[in-house]
Amino acid sequence: MKTPHILMMAAGTGGHVFPALAVSEELSKRGAIIHWLGTPNGMENGLVAPTGYPFHAIEMQGLRGKGIGRLLKMPVTLLSATMAVIKIIRGNKIDMVVGFGGYVSAPGGIAARLTKTPLIIHEQNAIAGMSNRYLAKMATKVLQAFENTFGNDQLDAKLETVGNPVRNAISGVAEPTIRYDINDQSPLKLLVVGGSLGAQVLNDTVPKALALIERPFEVRHQCGRHNEVTTQSAYASEDLSAHEFTVQPFIDDMAAAYNWADIVVCRAGALTVTEIQNVGIAAIFVPLPSAVDDHQTANARTLTLHKAAILLPQNELTPKRLSDELALLDRAACLEMAKKGHALANRQACQHVADIIWQAL
């Protein structure tokens, strides 16, 4: 087989980009040449740059909930973006297009169809996004992380449940029984993660909740870029003398952060849920209420049903409620939650997805 050229489509958030990076690394090891389709100013630029993959940027924006103006411009924008991707596919002799989500997937998938290039899509969330629901009809293969994501019997012949790929560094974190020492009397280590962009409600609520807890915690809080000053101020305005805390805009090494933590308070994006499950760590999920089709609540459902995590809807999130949940936890309770989540994980997802892509070339 000649050296395959694969165009990966992933943009906008870490939930799309990191799984695509994990699979790209595996495909590169097998000899594939990876190209990346993204947007000019998306976070994928900085994440993909260190890999050295050729990066192709197109102008494309989201549609849902963005107003009538963008809706009216969308046909022209989509046509222009699709033509740009056709040029990329032909100019780089692309053998396969693989979509992991983000605004670029729609024009990329359409371009694959028009150039008769095989298309594989992967849906990370428990409820499929609008672009992937559309592209599923024309894709060669449709991959889903959760069962019944697409709910379409017509897709059965090409539909496969594979889990969510995670990076090798995450998979390499020691299992819960090694990390948790139930005899350790030091303060519980609390990791607060608002996703790659941060979560203002966590930035506001967590400091107030900690002020209500007498038992000390050691806190590491990822607040999102541009939120560091206001989050530092939120901590400074409370009496937190019992606690140690660090605030930072972004955590580059999530594997080290998970290895450090006893419990995570976080959103329920697909990547976050999958990483917590793979690592095996106690979690309190606060799903983003504005997420399309409430997919974050659906993402967290398996872990919460198995008592591997606590679900705390944002409309119920108050400093008192969060402090009550945290106050009930000790290392033994965290370990039990972590073991249950770890037992549910699919740690072969990355290799499985790469196998499917390789076999389809």
UniProtKB/Swiss-Prot annotation:
Residues bound to UDP-N-acetyl-alpha-D-glucosamine are: T13, G14, G15, N125, R167, S196, I251, A270, L271, T272, V273, T274, E275, Q296
Q: What pathway is this protein said to act in by its record?
A: Cell wall biogenesis; peptidoglycan biosynthesis
The keyword Cell membrane is annotated on this UniProt entry: yes
* Gene Ontology annotations for the cellular component aspect, listed alphabetically: plasma membrane
**What is the enzyme's class at the highest EC level?**
transferase
The organism sits in which domain of life? Bacteria
Q: Which Gene3D superfamilies match?
A: Glycogen Phosphorylase B
Q: Cell inner membrane: is it a keyword of this entry?
A: yes
* InterPro entries reported in the protein's UniProt record: GlcNAc_MurG, Glyco_trans_28_C, GlycoTrans_28_N
Catalyzed chemical reaction(s) = di-trans,octa-cis-undecaprenyl diphospho-N-acetyl-alpha-D-muramoyl-L-alanyl-D-glutamyl-meso-2,6-diaminopimeloyl-D-alanyl-D-alanine + UDP-N-acetyl-alpha-D-glucosamine = di-trans,octa-cis-undecaprenyl diphospho-[N-acetyl-alpha-D-glucosaminyl-(1->4)]-N-acetyl-alpha-D-muramoyl-L-alanyl-D-glutamyl-meso-2,6-diaminopimeloyl-D-alanyl-D-alanine + UDP + H(+)
Topological category with respect to the lipid bilayer: Peripheral membrane protein
Query: GO MF annotations for this entry?
Result: UDP-N-acetyl-D-glucosamine:N-acetylmuramoyl-L-alanyl-D-glutamyl-meso-2,6-diaminopimelyl-D-alanyl-D-alanine-diphosphoundecaprenol 4-beta-N-acetylglucosaminlytransferase activity; undecaprenyldiphospho-muramoylpentapeptide beta-N-acetylglucosaminyltransferase activity
Entry keywords, A to Z: Cell cycle, Cell division, Cell inner membrane, Cell membrane, Cell shape, Cell wall biogenesis/degradation, Glycosyltransferase, Membrane, Peptidoglycan synthesis, Transferase
Example GO biological process term?
lipid glycosylation
Q: What EC number(s) does its UniProt record assign? A: 2.4.1.227
Q: Where in the cell is it found?
A: Cell inner membrane
Family label: Belongs to the glycosyltransferase 28 family. MurG subfamily.
Role, per record: Cell wall formation. Catalyzes the transfer of a GlcNAc subunit on undecaprenyl-pyrophosphoryl-MurNAc-pentapeptide (lipid intermediate I) to form undecaprenyl-pyrophosphoryl-MurNAc-(pentapeptide)GlcNAc (lipid intermediate II).
**Protein name, as recorded:** UDP-N-acetylglucosamine--N-acetylmuramyl-(pentapeptide) pyrophosphoryl-undecaprenol N-acetylglucosamine transferase
State the species of origin.
Psychrobacter arcticus (strain DSM 17307 / VKM B-2377 / 273-4)
Q: What is the lineage of its organism?
A: Bacteria, Pseudomonadati, Pseudomonadota, Gammaproteobacteria, Moraxellales
